[in-house]
Amino acid sequence: MDRQLKSVLGFDARTQKSAFVLAGLTAALLLTVSMPSGAIASPDPSTPPPPTSITLTGVVRDFKERTVQNGHPDFEITPAHGYAHYCGALSADLGSDGKPMFIGQGFKVKSGYEWRNSAGKNICWRLYDPARGDLIGKKDGTYIDNGGITNAASFGTWFHDAPGTNLSCALSLVLNRSADGSYVFDSTIDPQCVANGGFFPIEGQLFGNPGGSPNRNFHFTYELHTEFTYDAAGAQMFLFRGDDDVWVYVNGRMVIDLGGVHSAVEQRVELNRLGLTNGEVYTLDFFFAERHRTQSNFRIQTNLLLHTASVPSVTSAFD
């Protein structure tokens, strides 16, 4: 194509460059028109939304109360200093088998004087830190009382299979995501628990209901072994409210101590207290016991994305 023909057709380098610029401006204008003011881009589809629930599977062990043949001495017992919240009966660290260890240095917490954080929420006495503005609790006297745990041998069967003493099976809990983003299992709203009048997950199973009034299976323990990823910016927490005994360990260290036979009591742990490393995976081990009539309450609330790490062997299938 000679220069004269290019000139006639308007096809020179300057015209070509102008056409490209105009096309780019047109595209940008169309994009601007299609995105309303204040609109934001869609989230990355490769990032999945948080799950609507998490399922945790652990082991429940059934016991017979102390007044019957082959009954366990720690179940349906009244502690020497009465029904109350007791601490200190167990070691600060899990044993080599991943289970809590009895040390027999328990004390009764004075009513109304729990250890609390600066917001007034109950925390484990072992995590008390005055530099954070925590409020110190009080012991009810100087005596030792382990909250109705007879000795190390009796406690040794709480979270271990013991032929003739307990029967065990797997048990799963579903924690549903709430509006604030935390995951909750609450026996006061769970349909099956409401129908049963409380947290009685093995009604008519294993040793069965013992009779009496109310005729519920009150005498059992439950353990969970889970993992999570620590997020230093996530304000991560774990809370339990219920009865009777509950102990929680993170990275093998006790962070909740709710020993004793008592009505519903609450403690929480804020994970930024624990010196964890951002992005690392840690264990959370949970141990619960229901030891006495007439109530059984159980509430877990957490914003941790927990998942089951392991399920110990059991003596019975769960249907």
Regions found by a protein language model. Name each.
Residues M1-S18:
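N-terminal secretory signal peptides that target proteins for export/translocation
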Residues A13-K17, A23, R241:
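Hydrophobic alpha-helical segments and their boundary regions
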Residues I40-D319:
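Acidic/polar, compositionally biased interaction segments
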Residues L5, Q16, T32-M35, I40:
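Intrinsically disordered, low-complexity segments
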Residues L9-D12, L25, S37:
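N-terminal regions of proteins, emphasizing targeting and processing segments when present
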Residues A23-S34:
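Bacterial N-terminal signal peptides
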